[in-house]
Amino acid sequence: MDRDDVPYLDATLPTAQRVTDLLARMTLAEKVGQMMQLDSREDLDDHVLRKHVGSILHTSPERVLRAHDLTTRTRLQVPLLIAEDCIHGHSFHDGATIFPTQLGMAATWDPQLVEQVARVTAVEASATGVHWTFSPVLCIARDLRWGRVDETFGEDPVLIGELAAAMVRGYQGDGLTDDTAILATAKHFAGYSETQGGRDASEADLSRRKLRSWFLPPFERVAKEGCATFMLGYQTTDGVPITVNSWLLDEVLRGEWGYQGTLITDWDNVGRMVWEQKLQPDYAHAAAAAVKAGNDMIMTTPQFFEGALQAVEEGLLDEKDLDQAVTRILTLKFDLGLFENPRRPDTARQQSMINHDDHVALNLQVARRSLVLLRNDGVLPLAKGKIAVVGPLADDPQTQLGDWAGSSGQADWLPNGQPRDMITTILDGLRELSPDVTYARGADILTLEPDPEGETFPDGQPRPRIIQPCEPDAQLIAEAVAAADAADYVVAVVGDRIELVGEGRSTATLDLIGGQIALLDALAETGKPMIVVLLASKPLVLPESARDAAALVWVANPGMQGGRAIAELLHGLIEPSGRLPISFAAHAGQQPTYYNQIRGQHGSRYADLTQEPAFAFGEGLSYTTVEYGDLHVETAVLRPDETVRASITLTNTGTRPVRETVQVYV
């Protein structure tokens, strides 16, 4: 192809002119293909050469290169958008930097730090040929039984909006022409987390007032920040799938907010309208509905290709209906400069930038700042002495990383997870700092059994296996008690595992499962000072033996450097500064327990239990005391869209340094 004679290949022309020229050259099938994003683990030749796909996801390094090579064989050689779930680091690239989960980041309450995390993630991901990440998550986490709480920034829309905006800035860098920039995705628009009984992807029973008051403001914040793409949730609201919700997509997002970015469905949303929600009779009608609703990129619905072609043939769609979506997709590709440089994997950049020393240092800093001290009777920082480290999660590298990382199950090209020598577990960290450490597992947590309904869902996706909690093991408990009896301090590491976290893995209970409660009870009876480290993806309900422990630290999947950070905290080498971005329930039956609930007519309690959380949003201790004084509100009169400004004097009244997060509730 002679580039001089083809306007869309002329980089000196305005993007709009290039898009118009290319769109005029495309066949109907090529337009439909541009609207599709398919799984690269399937038939790449079919995806690229027959379906003309605009994007692929779940790409191993080998598949990325092959996909680019296939693109050079297509008629128009339109470059692909390469997408991946880089949720808290470049999650599925061997040796990449894996940070704390989004909920862990939220415990820092620090937008600048979160922006740095996203910037590092973009630098590492872009070096491997990834153009697009499906992050950040802006869902409000209220029901702790929901399996995806760990992916959120917690329960407060203001905190969520500020941290998400910071993440968008980090991902998209200095603009899309920056080779280290990747497209950010605000998800899951909107109300996805407002589940039925905490069950993932269930009907969201939300009024428009509730959406506008709580669930939409974070999305509006990142829309105005320039977030390039929005992902639509799986769920229905008022019986209407978000995928075709004209009020949300047209009136609010495109209309009121003036959003000009690209909309992508979540996994097989269009297909779900046919086979799951049963709101469309076939794929032709589903494709027509999705296009007319304003969807631009259809994720992993292979049947959309034939369905859209059939819809045009039957008059359900006009070919021009596709043009607006294809225009937005092509505009992204031109803005990224992919026609001049498709941004293939860059081996030299990978070697110099992935897991760079600066990235490791940032990872440790974020892990340190994410730790939340919830109880301390004075035992921390630890004095010299022998430490018994017990618990099934004390030496568990995958639980350190959390979901959407390593061997969490989404990437078949990384079956053994991230390199073990890159991960410092809690046991590793304590052994590095303490000369006298013993270890006993103390309990098992769970085993897995096949789902009796079959190995896959109707769309072919694998069903998670069923959890079977392990019974307390008398021998393991006896070994742990013996270790505790011989030590000066007990560090008990308990929590949840990856099998209890994520899509389709919501839990009916919030209790510690398996033999963990029996282990804690037995350790408490030894009388030795017990420090409970709750290594948990989300807040759990703790037994009395944990609530009454000498100290309690919550750690939300702290990433590769988490074990080192925890050991430093326990030994007093760093100061605890994390604050809860989400409340802890005292009982699963209290759900939800978010801090800013509206009081009911008959108060805020049950007949048998109060609604008070075990620990509330914003809580977190330090190793010193801080006195607040001289509060002065500088804004005497507040008009719409103005900002309240105030000042306060903080005094460190203790003997150790402190980082204090000043919280203002209006």
What are these regions (language model features)?
Residues 1-666:
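Glycoside hydrolase catalytic-domain context in secreted enzymes
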